[in-house]
Amino acid sequence: DISEFVRTMPGVNLTGNTATGQRGNKRQIDLRGMGPENTLILIDGKPVNSRQSERISMRGERNTRGDSNWVPVEEIESITVLRGPAATRYGSGAMGGVVNIVTKKVSKEFKGQVNLYANQPQDSKEGATRRIGFNLSGPIIQDTLGFRIYGNLNKTDADAADINAGHGNDSAAGVEGVRNKDIAGRLQWKISPAQTLILDSSYSRQGNIYNGDTQNSNPRSALVNSLADGKAETARLYRSAYSLTHDGAWEWGDTKNVISYERTVNSHLPEGLAGGPEGSYTGLDFVQSRLKNLRFSSEANIPFKLGVDNVLTVGAEFTDSKLDDPASNSQGFKDQGKTDVFDGISAVRGGKASQRNWAAYVEDNISLTDKTHLIPAIRFDHNSDSGSNWSPALNFSHQIGENWLVKGGVARAYKAPNLYQTNPDFILYTRGQGCPIDAPNSVRCYYMGNGNLKPETSI
């Protein structure tokens, strides 16, 4: 998982999405303390959104490891981290920053390798890791057509169920285990000296090894104990991704046009949707959440001189997201003896939700001197649920000597509500946990999606 590498960089933590500590055994990449929901993960510049297929809890957590484990470490060429205002041009979900995982290029010579890796912790209660992978890359037609393929099998055992013993009856679980299977291929066609066409395809299966986590560290039920003792696989994530990229290198500048499609099937045991047992497994029959993301993007980088050197970047994007998660919409209103209807929301609630987003952005990288750069930018988004938003930004950097680089900036960042938050059929019930708006009086209440939510903004 690349999160273990990224966490060593300045401004990077591994946390949950809130300060509750819920799902603390599944920490995700968090930039500048803004939370994983405000950290955008990219693979070769394309957003990865599989974690969005996981239901969001009352406190804003998700039962997910995030999207940092889809590419084997051996296949990564570099990892770029953008923090704060510099990430504004990437739009919703990048309020904290962006992590771009760049995979290895197609090689000009035919070559391949097999990798074996093992890690055995000194403490026998911590999970060991074993991994095997391969890659093969080279030309099919020299200087015209090339390919790359890689595969990976990885297993990290779960921490022992009693690794945090001493907390009474609470189930403060250790780190959950994971089984990964990945395979990916690339065809690269150099159409002309100025144009390259790249076709990417990948498939991954990610399953867990359960060790007793219940979100709220509830006393373990017989079901939870049985699943933990058997090291059961309680969640299986299947991710398929396809993309077609056209790169152009022209006399006037560079262009990149991308069509990408990502499909995630999130198969997991059903979870409680009310009170303290919310997030704890309640049965043995798997349910599914399906998420589809279609994206078109176009970008041009145009160098020019206006007193000093400039590089103007202009781009546009369109995304279409569709979610179908009927199991997470099964909570009713009957718990308080009322009919299962409220404010026009009937007892028959669907799990389908969709969202579209159109965006355009402009950025100018101005080289005031060889060591000083000024970068004004602006981005416009229109979301089918939450409406329009403008995100201006101004960034500055100055090189001081060989070892020091000073950076600063200001921006209006933006986060659109997710597909659960905007779906009025999505309901959670606090039961005996109290209502956040009147917590001292322990009033019960419902969390409901709202199609009229506005985006979050931050300066």
Across the structure, where does each feature detected by a protein language model lie?
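N-terminal periplasmic accessory domains that precede
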Residues: 2-5, 27-30, 42-44, 66-69, ...
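Outer-membrane beta-barrel signature, preferentially recognizing the C-terminal barrel domain
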Residues: 222-246, 349-355, 399, 403-405, ...
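Face-selective signature of the C-terminal outer-membrane beta-barrel domain
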Residues: 188-206, 231-388, 399-401
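Periplasmic-side early beta-strands and strand-to-turn transitions of outer-membrane beta-barrels
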Residues: 107-231
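Transmembrane beta-strand segments that form the barrel wall of outer-membrane beta-barrel proteins
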Residues: 112-120, 154, 373-383, 390, ...
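Outer-membrane beta-barrel translocator domains and adjoining extracellular loop/strand segments
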Residues: 124-129, 159-168, 204, 210-218, ...
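Short acidic/polar hinge/loop motifs at secondary-structure boundaries
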Residues: 47-83
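Extracytoplasmic beta-strand/coil segments of soluble accessory domains associated
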Residues: 3-51, 77
